[in-house]
Amino acid sequence: MAWTAPRTWVSSEVVTAALMNTHMRDNLLWLGRVGVDGWSSWTPAITASTDPTLGSGSSVSGKYAQVGRLVAYWAHVQFGTSGTNAGSGTYEFSLPVNNNNTTDNVIGGGTMFDSGPNTRYVCALERINAAEMRMIEAVSKTTVSSSSPFTPAASDVYKWWGVYESAS
């Protein structure tokens, strides 16, 4: 089933079941299918003053779906088991598609897992420019960095997800 351009309704027109099925039901089903089947792969990046080294055995993945200007996304980064380095400075995380850079700053949520003490942290995602966002740890309200709220090391995990309006 393909998208059908929505009909321009005329005053006093009789709305039939066939018209509603074509212009409402079928298009809504198409939009629902795009959200499920329309995911694209994306490789998120973490940058800082000195970029972190994820090490051997690391895992980086992400997916996003775009319907019009609406972008839904998720990402997962796991540091490897050896050869990791936290780098230095505030962490900035790439977005799959440039955002419009004018709407609300909060564009999602996430979790961080510090494997050493087996501790999880919750965070909000704040856009910083059209292509990147940063994490704000929920309890301390500090920006996530190479040393806050913990220094990432072997097997630590960052996960994030959200929805935002794209630039185009």
Name these PLM-found stretches.
Residues 3-56, 100-104, 109, 154, ...:
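Glycine-rich, low-complexity segments
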Residues 1-4, 74:
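Short acidic (Asp/Glu) and glycine-rich catalytic loops that position anionic groups and cofactors
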Residues 128-168:
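Domain-scale recognition of soluble eukaryotic interaction modules
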Residues 57-116, 159-165:
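Beta-rich globular "head" domains
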Residues 81, 117-121, 140-146:
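Short, surface-exposed beta-strand/loop "edge" segments at domain boundaries and coil↔beta transitions
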